[in-house]
Amino acid sequence: TLLSSIILIWVGKKIDDFDVLKFSFFVISLLAISTFTFSKINSITFLFIAILLMRFSGQGMMSHTASTTISRYFTNTRGKALSTGWFGLSTAEFLMPVTIIYALTIMDWRNIWIIISVSIILFLPLVSYFLVKEVKLSSREDDNEVAKENIKQWKRSEVIKDYRFIIIALNMLAMPWIATGIFVYQSFILSAKNWGEYTIAQSFMVYSIASVLTLFVAGYLIDKFTSRKLLIYMNIPFLISLLILIYFQSPVSSFFFLGLIGVSNGFANVLGSSTWAELYGVKFIGSIKALTTALMVFSTAFGTAFFGLMIDFDFSIEQISMISGGYILISLILLFLIKNKLNPTIL
């Protein structure tokens, strides 16, 4: 995971320089190779290579390519476009586990990976061709309102020196690192709270529904009010969810706990792309998004390690939640202090 995030910083920025269709074919091919590699695993070394390719091409480059392209070529309806794109991902997260579980009952797991790889090669290039065949590098700026408004197009080297980027990133990274820790160590939460073994699994239905519904609400609100004005509210439901985890013991509270995380996740998915485009322009959005996506991937690894370390040091789930909530609160306060400065630079 860590290695894939480092590679993503360099490879991800190339989307600014290449034709979208060709870049998409590259990412699709890489994903097909990674899934096929899983079908041939016979050693720890091969497993490492397969996971590296999967994390890089799947979680990293596929989402990076989609969100970057939408952020660049949509302006007035960017929020709705991003929410529609993320809806596809959320739908897959809901349907694919069920599909794979069923497939495991009728065939060997290696054959499943081969089928996935072949399906990727057969269908995704065709879909990509019809979706972005007319999108060229030359069409990027001509009729884009950002260009007409003479908004500064920030390079990545400039963005990383901007204090606003650091503060926004602190808020953006709360979801991936804390939520990943919660999801990975859900058995620890079940044990600590004396909840039934299926409590969190059932609560995930509420999480999924809340996340998907919030996607579309967020998309509409972004187009109406801008990402910059909504950003301050993104992690408030998440903070409340941690307070629920700290102070409530009833199994019913898990539905509110994960439901509120779903609300913040829905907002974070859309705001995580649209905010950078609004604030820093779209000319170099690929390199900027490559950095933020890499940070997201890195933070998921950090979250797993952090929660594991805290558990090893005998921290309770309430104490871990307090630390996590403290992080969210501090990042929210910092964001509140600069909320009036979250405007693009006009040339």
Tell where the protein language model's regions lie, with residue ranges:
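Central cavity-lining transmembrane alpha-helices of secondary-active solute carriers
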Residues: 1-12, 205-217
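Hydrophobic core of transmembrane alpha-helices in multi-pass small-molecule transporters
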Residues: 45-61, 253-267
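Cytoplasmic helix-loop-helix junction between adjacent transmembrane helices
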Residues: 52-87, 281
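Helix-loop-helix hairpin linking two adjacent transmembrane segments in secondary transporters
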Residues: 89-135
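A late C-terminal transmembrane helix in Major Facilitator Superfamily
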Residues: 93, 282-314
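Flexible cytoplasmic inter-helical loops of multi-pass small-molecule transporters
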Residues: 132-154, 347
